[in-house]
Structures are given as structure tokens and as C-alpha cells.
Swiss-Prot record:
Reaction catalyzed: S-ubiquitinyl-[E2 ubiquitin-conjugating enzyme]-L-cysteine + [acceptor protein]-L-lysine = [E2 ubiquitin-conjugating enzyme]-L-cysteine + N(6)-ubiquitinyl-[acceptor protein]-L-lysine
Gene symbol of the encoding locus: RMA2
Protein name listed in UniProt: E3 ubiquitin-protein ligase RMA2
Entry keyword set: Endoplasmic reticulum, Membrane, Metal-binding, Transferase, Transmembrane, Transmembrane helix, Ubl conjugation pathway, Zinc, Zinc-finger
Organism: Arabidopsis thaliana (Mouse-ear cress)
Superkingdom: Eukaryota
């Protein structure tokens, strides 16, 4: 989108926003976002991670544990695997003469599922299952309906008079008995058929 100024015949190009890189403090080129939410130019963050890796390598050459580079803003871990590229319209192609590699493709998630985790080697697998939150809510509703938790049952009847409150509580009690009967009938049908 081009915006023309009538006074001095200059053209301003709107590239989709005035977002600044947190390193060079200029408008972002080849923008990438860290998982902590900070926006950087790809060449700037690449130079930052490369420079911090080299300086850390020189200082810790005898120390075998290597820490990943840190975000310049909040000091959380940053690597090429944790950078998410932002694509927009009208972006220029990267210059072929620069020594900065192309932007990363973004984080890759393991599609094996939440319930699996790999240990040290491929042969060690630990399986764990997380309970389904929907099932927990359903179980809690059935429990409250069947066994009538008194603390939760009194809240809806606070603003009623005594007679209508008693009728509503009796209706709810008979409804819970009907639910209990239907639940028992359903289990009996499952076991018998």
C-alpha cells in the first residue's frame, strides 16, 4: 500500500505495521518471534545467537555444559528451533550475498501424542496418560447430581421463599433419583447385552 504526500512528492511504503526489532531498534526485516513473544529481525537475532555462542565457547571452553543463547530482552532460552518466522505480503527476497542463512521454518512439534515421552535412548519409552478434563467435569456433575452435595445445592435457592425452596429441592431430589435409576439401568443393559 503506497501513501503519497502531496507536499514534496515522496512516497512512503507501508509494510504492514511499525514493528521494531528489539536489537537494532529499526523496522523489522525478515521478522521472527521468539516463544517468549519478542520480535526481532532474522539477521539481528542470528548474529546475536552466533556471537553469544562464540563468546560463551571461548569463556567456557573447559566447561562441558553449554547453555543455549538467551533472549536479549527477557533472558529466556533462544535457538533456531524456538524461533517462529512471520510471513507477510510484499516482503523482499533475501539477499544472496549475505552470510546470514535463511530464516528457520519454526518449531516442529512431535506428532506422537501427548501421552508418550522418549527417555535417554530410543528403547526406553515411558508412557503416561493425562486424564481428560471433560471426563472429570462429567464425573463431577454426575457425582453432584447423584449424591447431592448440599453446599452447591443451596446456592440457587437463596432468593426464594421457604415453600418454593422446599418444592425446588424436592423436585431436584426426585430428578436425582430418576438419574440414578437411568444410570443403573444403563449399566445393567451394558452388562446383560
Amino acid at each position: 500500500m503506497e501513501i503519497e504526500k502531496d507536499e514534496d512528492d515522496t512516497t512512503l511504503v507501508d509494510s504492514g505495521g511499525d514493528f521494531d526489532c528489539n536489537i537494532c531498534l529499526d523496522q523489522v526485516r525478515d521478522p521472527v518471534v521468539t516463544l517468549c513473544g519478542h520480535l526481532f529481525c532474522w539477521p539481528c537475532i542470528h548474529k546475536w545467537t552466533y556471537a553469544s555462542n562464540n563468546s560463551r565457547q571461548r569463556v567456557d571452553q573447559y566447561d562441558h555444559k553449554r547453555e543455549p543463547p538467551k533472549c536479549p530482552v527477557c533472558k529466556s532460552d533462544v535457538s533456531e528451533a524456538t524461533l517462529v518466522p512471520i510471513y507477510g505480503r510484499g516482503q523482499k527476497a533475501p539477499q544472496s550475498g549475505s552470510n546470514v542463512p535463511s530464516r528457520p521454518t519454526g518449531p516442529v512439534y512431535d506428532l506422537r501424542g501427548v501421552g508418550q515421552r522418549l527417555g535417554e535412548g530410543e528403547s526406553q519409552r515411558y508412557m503416561y496418560r493425562m486424564p481428560d478434563p471433560v471426563m472429570g467435569v462429567v464425573c463431577e456433575m454426575v457425582y453432584r447430581r447423584l449424591f447431592g452435595e448440599s453446599s452447591s445445592n443451596m446456592a440457587p435457592y437463596r432468593d426464594m421463599n421457604v415453600r418454593s425452596r422446599r418444592r425446588a429441592m424436592q423436585a431436584e431430589e426426585s430428578l436425582s433419583r430418576v438419574y440414578l435409576f437411568l444410570l443403573c439401568f444403563m449399566f445393567m443393559c451394558l452388562f446383560l447385552f
